[in-house]
Design a protein with these regions (language model features):
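A conserved short beta-strand
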Residues: 35-47
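Short beta-strand/loop motif that positions the catalytic acidic residue
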Residues: 59, 64-67, 71
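Alpha/beta-hydrolase active-site loop
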Residues: 1-7
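Acidic catalytic loop of the alpha/beta-hydrolase fold
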Residues: 69-75, 104-105
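Gly/Ala-rich beta-loop-alpha elbow adjacent to hydrolase catalytic centers
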Residues: 17-22, 26
Length: 124
């Protein structure tokens, strides 16, 4: 929030982008913000404690989850589990992309999908 103030940005001008632990942090923070952000992109992470989210959710920004199907750090099963947890908490705009042949990382196809999502949510 301090950075948003410093940069003179409104929440609707922000898409949160996270990788691995950053995704986990983003999926914890974004739904609990009073002022909804434009969206969130999460690579190779998981939704921690989805049962708590149902009672703690305040805002439901659009969320794009991206995961490599060869990830040996955070299993690919974390993607559908996160999507399911978000939907149970009332999220309607949850999107997913699987990066074929990708381990715990960001591949060009995933980055392209993420950029298109961010452009769409920011109206660019």
């Amino acid at each position: 929030d301090a950075l948003m103030v410093d940069e003179d940005l409104l929440p609707e001008q922000v898409v949160l982008f996270g990788f691995s632990q950053g995704t986990m942090m983003g999926l914890h923070v974004a739904p609990r913000r009073e002022d909804a952000i434009a969206g969130m992109v999460g690579f190779s992470g998981r939704l921690m404690e989805p049962d708590l989210l149902v009672d703690e959710v305040i805002s439901r920004p659009p969320i794009l989850l991206i995961h490599g199907d060869q990830d040996d750090v955070v299993p690919i099963a974390s993607l559908p589990e996160a999507a399911d947890g978000l939907q149970k908490a009332g999220f309607q705009d949850v999107f997913a992309h699987v990066q074929k042949g990708t381990a715990h990382g960001i591949a060009s196809d995933g980055l392209s999908v993420a950029l298109a999502f961010m452009r769409d949510k920011l109206g660019l």
